[in-house]
Amino acid sequence: MAQLKFNSILVVCTGNICRSPIGERLLRKRLPGVKVKSAGVHGLVKHPADATAADVAANHGVSLEGHAGRKLTAEMARNYDLILAMESEHIAQVTAIAPEVRGKTMLFGQWLEQKEIPDPYRKSQDAFEHVYGMLERASQEWAKRLSR
């Protein structure tokens, strides 16, 4: 089996209650042995995952149970080998918090033609389903590339 190039991945979005918890759980499932966590640039500290996000994930066999929102800190960012952000603006915010991590910060949708993953917060269930599909495809692509 090929050796993984990264031992730890941090998934970042805005509030750490919708996109990044799903991305975290999908990558954990696909990359066993890799430490995968999530945080938000404006993290809603200790908040559970958004109810619609949790329902949509559960419908696809992914549990967000036990998730507690975290706010990104510079120290946290430094402690991960790879940081995957949902939007270009998140990359800018991560860089403002910890400039030295810019070189290891990329879009979660990097392998989906560098697509940003839109925020479904307070939108319809269909919006959450669309975002889940993007996160699913992006996590598959990351797992393929990181497992080589």
Swiss-Prot record:
Top-level taxonomic group: Bacteria
EC assignment: 3.1.3.48
InterPro entries documented for this protein: LMW_PTPase, Ptyr_pPase, Ptyr_pPase_sf, Tyr_phospatase_low_mol_wt
A Pfam family hit: LMWPc
Similarity comment: Belongs to the low molecular weight phosphotyrosine protein phosphatase family.
Its biological purpose: Dephosphorylates etk.
Name of the molecule in the record: Low molecular weight protein-tyrosine-phosphatase Etp
Species annotation: Escherichia coli (strain K12)
